[in-house]
Every structure is written in C-alpha cells, then in structure tokens.
Amino acid sequence: RRDEFRASSSLTFGTYGWLDPPVSLAFDIPYEVQWARTYVGVWGGTPRYTGWVGLEVNNGSVTKTDLFGKDDKSENVYVTGYGVYWVAYDTTSQVKTGHNTLIATTSKNDPNNKLDGRIYAVVTVVVVKDPRGGSSRYWIAEGNENLHGEGWSGTTPTKHDEATVTFPVAGITGISSSNLTVVYLASARGQPDYLLLNIQDIGNTLTDKKK
C-alpha cells in the first residue's frame, strides 16, 4: 500500500524493543491533525500460530485484529517469514491535538494461546497542518518485506536479500530538504543489513550490538 499527499508537516512517534504486552506509546501533537496511521509489529512464533492484536487510542474502545498466520488475508495485516506481523490502523479520527496515549496488546496471556505475542514496535505517523506555512509532499510506503539470505520456503530454496521502493518525484522543483524514515523489525544473527538511497549508503550497518 502507498499513500501520497501534500500537507504542511509530518511527525513520527514510536516505541521499539521486543516487549511483552501491553506496550504504550505517548506523544504530543502541536497542530491540527490531517492524517494519522499507527502500526504494531507482533512476533507470532511460527507461521502456524494464530491469535489477535488490539489497539486502544486515548482511552477509547480496543480495536482487535485477528491474526491467522500464513493464511492471513486481512488488508491491514502484513505477515511474512516465520510469523512476523506488521498491522496497520487508520487512527486519523482518534489522535488529537495535544497529548495522546496509545496502548497495544495481544493474545499472549490468553488461556490456551500459542501466539508468542511479543511486540516489536508501536509507530504512529501523523500529518499536521502547520500554521507556520510551507508545503511538503509525502510518500508513505506500507508493507512488510521478509529479507533473508539463503533459506527455504517449505521444500523450495529461496533468497530475498533486497527490497526496493520507488518514489515518483519527477517534476518537483525547489526542494529545500528531504527526510526518509524506515522501520526495520528483525534480522538474522550476524547478518549485516544496509539502507541505500539512489545507490548511496545512508545508514550505518546494523549489527547484533545495535538492536
């Protein structure tokens, strides 16, 4: 999924780790909200385990999303690899100017639950109307790539060691600045990973010591 729009300013908030639920994210928004989307990363344990993830925004009701493992076909659920979930929520109508608190939870503590249920991250992207003026253009590419070296998918050998996203910037003039934010959930021990923009390496190599 890709969203493209023009607005005044964008803000990104997140909590990262590999934490037992519930996991909370608190942040302040200074201006009027125009668009917001929240993402929750969940570790399933295996592609066979099922369960659910829930998101509560500003003391509202919990929005639960069922997780069906390798059989998942929900539009807002991206599951890859050995049960790595990335779940998206439209939170435009729920976040507000001022202080916000989001709480993510899973079925980890339910009786007879098999889903691992630990949470990789809770991330919210907010586009606001900045009264100070100016105009920005945004591309938000949404998905979950299972990057890996030599491996197996069932009995089929596989390799998927790169993913490419293209942003159509032709015709844009007068660019004064640009920013790129990438969320990286998991890797294999000892495997170096890189982030390139127009062939230029723009990130430090991620190692086991940087988690």
Describe these PLM feature segments.
Residues 1-211:
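Disulfide-rich extracellular domains of secreted proteins
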